[in-house]
Amino acid sequence: AETKCPYLPPHEWALDFPHLMLRAKAQNFENKDTKWRDRIITSTDPIFDAISTPGIAQMANAAANSKPLRKAGQALFGIHQDAPLPTFIPKPLTESLEGYIGDHAQVTSSEKTTGKVAIFVTCYGDHNEPQMVEDLIAVLNHNGVPVKILQDAKCCGMPKLELGDLKKVEKMKDANIPVFQQAIAEGYDIIAPIPSCVLMYKQELPLMFPGHTDVANVKAHFFDPFEYL
């Protein structure tokens, strides 16, 4: 069964509680009432890019599995010693994959889709779980769907949204929307393997920028992998 806030529209109270809490987070951020730790760990683009390099990735992974260092991290930064941390790869996936994969396949469009997919690999797919993206590509190619890898996209902005840093969310939106629009203009639909990243472009950004035609166009061409298949 679906679980959600019971007072969302069309309820007579029309209370969007999740976004009410988001407004509170944004106010806290504006008042500088957020931890520096949270400001750092939500800066995924510079942090992940710095770690996903030969030597550094291996050191970060070793540190994440070191009990003494995890205890120190809990004491210094408030990151629980038993909290799972992502494993980093020494080279981002977007630097390893070809730009176009399976482009020999015959394109078959449908009523809602073009039959070609541009994959927004996301921070997690690019730096932590590349196999997830590679498996998605294999499934799409198996079903006759040619794939393009979006090379220049930034973080979707969900970590900064949860922090309440709405200006940074807008900056990331401004960086990604042109990349997505270019792919759409070339006849591609957009897919991301991480549900929260899909949610940003299907729901959160359209709510934040209701009059933005490019955001609306990206929303119309953005799909969850299972929805697309």
Stretches found by the model and what they are:
Residues 15-229:
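Iron-sulfur cluster-binding electron-transfer modules in prokaryotic oxidoreductases
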Residues 2-7:
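C-type cytochrome heme c attachment motif
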Residues 10:
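Short functional micro-motifs and their immediate structural scaffolds
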